[in-house]
Amino acid sequence: MVDEILKLKKEKGYIILAHNYQIPELQDIADFVGDSLQLARKAMELSEKKILFLGVDFMAELVKILNPDKKVIVPDRSATCPMANRLTPEIIREYREKFPDAPVVLYVNSTSECKTLADVICTSANAVEVVKKLDSSVVIFGPDRNLGEYVAEKTGKKVITIPENGHCPVHQFNAESIDAVRKKYPDAKVIVHPECPKPVRDKADYVGSTGQMEKIPEKDPSRIFVIGTEIGMIHKLKKKFPDREFVPLEMAVCVNMKKNTLENTLHALQTESFEVILPKEVIEKAKKPILRMFELMG
């Protein structure tokens, strides 16, 4: 099946982009594997006009927004993000009225419709940097409460998080899990995602996005790393650092990320169906806060 996918991909002129949380078999056939920001940037650099995206809906839509002239297809239309779907345009409008001077900073894990109402988009890799650079001591931030709290800690700014309890179910680790792995692997370094709750972040050695997690073993010579994010990241790290050991903090699985399989990836290439289509107005409005993010990052 892998050979058939690679053959069809070449024949039809597709580039395959996969998120770090995809199953190992899909990471291995992808032309590029990365976090949402890395994938969006990669898509902008491509000369190819056809992209098969392996991730969840908001990520594929982000690629389409930044590459409106390219054909973007996905293997499973139902692969979505529960956290992104918790934030609605109505909630954003409500908080804009309450805090008219506060810029709206939306995490990339948000719907395209919500992005049209944002002042700037951020990722888990650059959220702190983006908020620091905004000329405001108060920001409205959504939809991840834990990332919002982390940004508040690091910037000293007032961060109003929306919706009330926005969070990623996959990253709800227990701080006790860190105590347990430290007993089992006393020399290990613990790296967790900023979407984790504060008690977990506070006990970790490092807090970082999946893109940042990849860079830590380049600087830290430790032999064992405990990883607090979705299980797919372990495969990416093991491939990049075969001489190190990577242990999951807990068996955290994103069922939506795992909806993509070799079977439906092959089917997507065969039929070229499930194309990502967005209204022109949404593309134009959502693109502005994304480009603002790139501007702020320099």
From Swiss-Prot:
Keywords: 4Fe-4S, Cytoplasm, Iron, Iron-sulfur, Metal-binding, Pyridine nucleotide biosynthesis, Transferase
UniProt-listed Enzyme Commission number(s): 2.5.1.72
Cofactor(s) this protein cannot do without: [4Fe-4S] cluster
Positions annotated to bind [4Fe-4S] cluster: 81, 168, 254
Gene Ontology molecular functions: 4 iron, 4 sulfur cluster binding; metal ion binding; quinolinate synthetase A activity
Entry binding sites for iminosuccinate: 19, 36, 107-109, 124, 193-195, 210
Co-factor note (free text): Binds 1 [4Fe-4S] cluster per subunit.
GO biological process: 'de novo' NAD biosynthetic process from L-aspartate
Reaction(s) the record says it catalyses: iminosuccinate + dihydroxyacetone phosphate = quinolinate + phosphate + 2 H2O + H(+)
One CC-aspect GO term: cytosol
Transmembrane segments: none
Compartments, as annotated in UniProt: Cytoplasm
Pfam families the UniProt entry points to: NadA
Top-level class of the enzyme under EC nomenclature: transferase
Pathway named in the protein's UniProt entry: Cofactor biosynthesis; NAD(+) biosynthesis; quinolinate from iminoaspartate: step 1/1
Activity regulation, free text: Inhibited by 4,5 dithiohydroxyphthalic acid (DTHPA) analogs, which bind to the catalytic iron site of the [4Fe-4S] cluster.
Effect on the protein upon substituting residue 107 to F: Loss of activity
Summary of the function given for this chain in its UniProt record: Catalyzes the condensation of iminoaspartate with dihydroxyacetone phosphate to form quinolinate.
Stated family: Belongs to the quinolinate synthase family. Type 2 subfamily.
Name of protein: Quinolinate synthase
UniProt source species: Thermotoga maritima (strain ATCC 43589 / DSM 3109 / JCM 10099 / NBRC 100826 / MSB8)
Gene name of the record: nadA
